[in-house]
């Protein structure tokens, strides 16, 4: 790899999980370490996060674990949410953490400043490396790399390690997309958003340290069951609407909501797992065409300006697919799908309840300004009548594991 390309990827500064990452939950479950495959290896099956295709292919999920019991208990710390980037460093050792600075009198304290400077320099040196992790079984495979079950050696913290090959990222020209995904996802703190604890890289690969979602992908569940019932659909839509509301409050537009990008936590709660097409939208509207065609709104496929209302459209498409088993505008060709989306042409099967029809019809409006707000979605009568807490469907979700 020439030096120019290496620097292009190395633009990702090495960072590490914050305090609620790999050091909190000791897990004694043991699994044998495996060797990572080469860039051309066909091992593993699906990759967890990168949005690398506009096709409706099962390319972004984690496989389910064989045990019905979750192997970790990741507690979200929503209070740590920040509106901008904040560097994170590897947790200090117990000895270092116990050394608290002594109170100093007002004014300059040369000794304290020197100690603080030394501490900062030491912190910068503590960077993650592959040797810090025990690598377990593959969880998935994708276009740019693989995802593995992993354990941080010191804390025994279970996580998912996403391995992306630099040569493949460069060849596809998506280095900037990866940087954007990391920048956005690493600063989001919400129970329905998969945590990105940190990242690091070596000469050939980029590694993302991710929260592990034991119950796998929503897409896999949907394939297995064909469609979801009203309660499960309304619950997922509620959780997703809450997560999107949080994203929008941080001026983040997701733009690629679909079953392949949604995972299930240990309690069966939904988690957005892929921010490859997401963007910060401080003030401007976007005109880039991205995401999956079945879920794209008219304003995006027509190349018009768009804003956070694109996520409301995707929410309507998702609600329809959960209840029916396929997207509302699905057709044999891209051209036909494009045409149906532009004209908002879709029909409901007889078994779709009236309340759900009303919500979906409100969300799938050609004019973005006519779509409801996320608050109105959460207050919709069909949602409030059918949605239930995530903890109440934990047993239902775990009982369906193979």
Swiss-Prot record:
Pfam families: Pkinase. Residues 133-383 form the Protein kinase domain. One of its GO terms (molecular function) is protein serine kinase activity. Activated by phosphorylation at Thr-288; this brings about a change in the conformation of the activation segment. Phosphorylation at Thr-288 varies during the cell cycle and is highest during M phase. Autophosphorylated at Thr-288 upon TPX2 binding. Thr-288 can be phosphorylated by several kinases, including PAK and PKA. Protein phosphatase type 1 (PP1) binds AURKA and inhibits its activity by dephosphorylating Thr-288 during mitosis. Phosphorylation at Ser-342 decreases the kinase activity. PPP2CA controls degradation by dephosphorylating Ser-51 at the end of mitosis. Residues 37-83, 91-101 have a biased composition (Polar residues). The modification Phosphoserine is found at residues 41, 51, 342. Residues 1-125 are annotated as: Disordered. ATP binds at residues 143, 162, 210-213, 260-261, 274. The modification Phosphothreonine is found at residues 287-288. Activation of CDK1, appears to be an upstream event of AURKA activation. Phosphatase inhibitor-2 (PPP1R2) and TPX2 act also as activators. Inactivated by the G2 checkpoint. Inhibited by GADD45A and p53/TP53, and through dephosphorylation by protein phosphatase type 1 (PP1). MLN8054 is also a potent and selective inhibitor. Activated during the early phase of cilia disassembly in the presence of CIMAP3. Inhibited by the small molecule inhibitor VX-680. Mitotic serine/threonine kinase that contributes to the regulation of cell cycle progression. Associates with the centrosome and the spindle microtubules during mitosis and plays a critical role in various mitotic events including the establishment of mitotic spindle, centrosome duplication, centrosome separation as well as maturation, chromosomal alignment, spindle assembly checkpoint, and cytokinesis. Required for normal spindle positioning during mitosis and for the localization of NUMA1 and DCTN1 to the cell cortex during metaphase. Required for initial activation of CDK1 at centrosomes. Part of a complex composed of NEDD9, AURKA and CTTN; within the complex NEDD9 acts as a scaffold protein and is required for complex formation. Identified in a complex with AUNIP and NIN. Interacts with FBXL7. Interacts with CPEB1, JTB, TACC1, TPX2, PPP2CA, as well as with the protein phosphatase type 1 (PP1) isoforms PPP1CA, PPP1CB and PPP1CC. Also interacts with its substrates ARHGEF2, BORA, KIF2A, PARD3, and p53/TP53. Interaction with BORA promotes phosphorylation of PLK1. Interacts with CIMAP3. Interacts with GADD45A, competing with its oligomerization. This is Aurora kinase A. It comes from Sus scrofa. The gene is AURKA.
